[in-house]
Design a protein with these regions (language model features):
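Mixed-charge (Asp/Glu-Lys/Arg
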Residues: 1-177
Length: 177
């Protein structure tokens, strides 16, 4: 991946609010980074953690969520991105993003920590952990964690992340060019 893409602004930031900064759009480098990932999914491991959070926040914005919030770099209380849809059946999701190397796994304790965030805040509908890597063996089968999946808890592995963002990219350009 060309380093210049990782130095560029990839989201259009709106005003700061109590929980962080609103994301109101994506910039051209966002599309270019997704295109690079589509060509070589392993390049996702080159993305610094904050840029990965921005990339994922941009994906939620492009997916049509009404409100996308990128939380501060520190003091986010286990919430990297907050997305909301309002109206009948309002939804509020927190996404905890893990920019891990290919050999590092998200552990069960990380997943349990997110469940703690869910139970402490009654306004959260669902928690997602999105990682560039994979989850430790046994997490998906863990009966205590499984009870929350898929309606309250979602675990998005690196391969699922790639599929998700490339699909959003392809939806943007279907029928163009």
């Amino acid at each position: 991946m060309p380093p210049v893409l990782l130095q560029a602004e990839i989201i259009r930031a709106g005003p700061n609010i109590d929980e962080g900064q609103l994301v109101i759009g994506v910039a051209i480098p966002w599309f270019e980074i997704i295109r690079e990932i589509a060509k070589d999914p392993k390049c996702r491991f080159q993305i610094p953690w904050r840029k990965l959070e921005e990339l994922i926040a941009g994906a939620y914005e492009r997916e049509g969520w009404e409100r996308v919030i990128l939380t501060p770099r520190s003091g986010d209380r286990g919430r990297d991105i907050i997305v909301e849809k309002h109206g009948i059946g309002s939804i509020r999701i927190v996404d905890q993003v893990k920019a891990y190397r290919p050999d590092r796994r998200v552990k069960a304790d990380d997943v349990r920590a997110l469940l703690g965030v869910l139970t402490a805040d009654p306004n959260i509908s669902k928690g997602i952990i999105t990682t560039t890597a994979e989850f430790a063996p046994g997490i998906i089968e863990d009966s205590q964690l499984r009870a929350f999946m898929p309606y309250r808890l979602e675990l998005k592995s690196g391969s699922e992340l790639v599929k998700w963002i490339v699909n959003i990219y392809n939806m943007e350009f279907r029928g163009h060019c």
